[in-house]
Amino acid sequence: YLAVLIWVIIKNWKEYKINKKDILIILTIILALVGILSIYFIKSADALKLITGTDYPGKRFETGGKEIKTIFSYVYSILFPYKIDTIGNPCELSSMISFYPIPMLIALVYLKKNIKNKKHFAFLIPMLIISIVYSVFMIFGVNETFAKLSLLYMTPPGRLAIPLGFSQILLIVYMLGNFKKEDIILKSEWLKKVGTLLSSIAIMYIALKTDMNILQNHPIYIYICGLILIYGIYQIVNINKEENKKRLIMLLIPVAILTGVSVHPIQKGISVLTDKPVAKKTQEIVSQDKENNLWICDSTNFMINNYLLASGAKIINSTNLYTNFDLYKTVLGEEKSQRPEVRYVYNRYSHINMEITADINDIELIQQDSLKIYLTSEKVKELGVKYILTTRYLEQFNTDDIVYKKLYDEDGMIIYYVEY
């Protein structure tokens, strides 16, 4: 967006004269923006403090590199709405169908050929700077000084795949709207065809090497993605011609529709919250004990934890949006909770699993965004927990002061009342 803003300013700078009315409008807009941002920072002060006070990612420092797979995942991202068995979370590889790096290379070739007349430079140069910086950051990485100055140090390199793809799409859209017949990229038809074929093979090779086995076991997918790639790149190389512009648009429209319309709803209806026995029992307990129904889930996954939350329970270990420092201090103790190796586990956004133990109070990083807390029955009492949903029997953890009383046991889901 900054690159687009620079282009708009440069394009209209000489043609537009600013008068007093314009200055007043600009000042009003600036004041309005300052006011909106001030309100946001004031109201979000506590949340921002929690976020920036966390080692991960509040004190994250990224320098990029080794993230080539998400750059080229657009080659097979059209398959994500359909059945893919080799990847559990396709959104981690989601990206825009951008034909990267072809739009960027076409723009570079055009700049070199038109260095004297500087036609279209106002748009192409800012957009290319953004594209190149993002590409270098993702593929090779940068030093700490550049990461700090560019404000990329808080950005995981994989998360740049979408804005990088968006920059390529903006280049394509600009070329579609502004390149004329005289804006020739390559004169030789033979060079265009050979370049299209070689670049398609190179892109497909990289995609196959980094695709987490999405394409390898499905030859038909390779053919489909390869044909889209070859056809699309050839039209981009000839984007100065009206007939090729139309062909590119006619390719992208059905691809966009087929990749969007086929996405199934995550859940239809709310019967999962109204008809399931464990949900009904949870809601019954919540309605009878509105003030003290503090829960945890033991030996479950984050989906069960959040399911309990959706059923109306006050649950400690649902997916946390902010770091719960009080929880960690209670379970681990003041000193241990502040150790660097322990703080590294903390996360602004985290799925929290819990497991009651006989004598261990500890925390473990399972993977990014997911941690596990081990706690004794004494810590359960300190936290004020009254109800536990679990998949195992907890009577073995009874103590002289704490007793787990079973309230519900059906289909592998068990609810306990904690008496102390």
Residues covered by each model-derived region:
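Transmembrane alpha-helices and membrane-interface helical segments
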Residues: V4-K11, I106-Y110, L128-I132, A161-E182, ...
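Membrane-interfacial entry segments at the cytosolic side of transmembrane helices
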Residues: K14-I29, K118-F123, I185-V194, N217-I222, ...
